[in-house]
Amino acid sequence: MVFISLKGTSIYEICFFFVICAIKNLKSHLMSFLKDKILYEGLTFDDVLLVPAYSEVLPREVDLSSMFTRNIRINTPVVSAAMDSVTEDELAIAISREGGIGVIHKNMSIEKQASQVKRVKRAENVMIFDPITINLEATVAEAMNLMSEYKIGGIPVIDNNGILKGIVTNRDLRFENNPSRKITEVMTTNLITTNHQTNLESAARILQKHKIEKLPMIDESGKLIGLITYKDITKTKDRPNSCKDDKGRLRVAGAVGIAADTMERVEALINANVDAISIDTSHAHTKSVINILKEIKRNYPKVEVVAGNIVTSEAAKKLVDEGADAVKVGIGPGSICTTRIIAGVGIPQLSAIYNVAKAIEGSGVPVIADGGIRYSGDIIKAIAAGADSIMAGSLFAGVEESPGDTIIYNGRKFKAYRGMGSIEAMQQGSKDRYFQDIEDDIKKLVPEGIEARVPYKGTLAEVIYQMTGGLRAGMGYLGAKNITILKKEGKFVRITHSGIIESHPHDVSITREAPNYSRKSFE
């Protein structure tokens, strides 16, 4: 017991003494509480910098190829998000041509999503083994509609037995004013053909010799078995970095949820030759998501399945044990996501990536870092923390190929961008992503995202060039010649808030924006 002499002490001093004692006692209890409850300190991209190392690697020499899933390699470690203002067929085609892969969102009918996957798969083919065809009874209007739907310039004409009878191209229809005219009256019948043994070089020589753009492949009976086009040969030579399957088709993934029609959607996407299925939810460490994952793998054991999103080591191990071919990391880091504020959950993205990557190290299951990427420097930080690729939404929402509406605001061009947890997106089909699919009353939806606008950025190719340029530069500083070495050797130093300020341009007024930097992203 402590005895205190109060002689000569005012009542105010006595009260102050007891208040101080109470505060110290409360602080002691709080520290005990925090010790029990706080697991660790979470870090994100702005909290760290990578430490440069001795290097013999030039940026132009690095290899950016990485794994998207267990069995799908991408040549650029960049994935476009499954968002209805980001990835549809046009952007999926563009990003695959740049070496990455797009995940077509599911806020559309099953038929429309499958059709978009088909468009991507048909956008480029070294040899098209299932070309779009038209029969002898078709009209000019039907041919035009097919060309418009699939964005193609020519269609082989076959009879009921599949025998090639001719070909109709956009040149044949360019000045045709009678849409009901039979296709047999306008098609070309004197055709140059080849067989399935023709290689790419031989096909190119035949096309050049006869000055034609399309070379049908037929079997011994005259049945159409494929098509080679000059345009696809040219694209193959012009874009050697494109992400393609073993048949020379661009790769694409499709998103599914946990709704009642999920397996129907999965079947349609697989029939459309999708390369991977992405189970798209806000929290994948749940019974419902795991059950869907198991059902997909049970019915389609060869299909590659991405499962997400998660942020903990326990979740990662569980999904890998249940058959996931890739895991997607991120709860709440996105620019249009409010999950951390509304639900109060999440882990800062850098720590989340490290948690997951460390937990499944050696499993052969790649990690996709989804969200929080604002600068190209964040990409290299994400990979050094353990990710195999990054997924982005806001970085691509402003490109020409994104499906978002174009907006003119204060004389500048913007594009609409919204979170899949926004009210509007949830109304159109993403409710199950946030486990609210049984709720029909809009007033009872609890959104976890917002609607926004982002500056128009030009073409996706221009954005990817700057993103990968920054990644290459960073790998050069670290002496990492490929992604594997970057993941293994990358080391961080933690920085203070003053260090963050010092890292950005300071003490000047920016007079001209750089194509890869915006102060607004920092603020």
Functional labels for PLM-detected ranges:
Residues 102-109, 277, 281-285, 329-343, ...:
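Glycine-rich phosphate-binding active-site loops on the catalytic face of alpha/beta enzymes
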Residues 110-116, 230-242, 263, 282-300, ...:
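Active-site-adjacent beta->alpha loops and helix N-cap segments on the catalytic face
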Residues 104-109, 152, 156, 163-179, ...:
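Short beta->alpha transition motifs characteristic of CBS
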Residues 30-54, 135, 195, 255, ...:
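Alpha/beta catalytic cores of nucleotide-metabolism and tRNA/nucleoside-modifying enzymes
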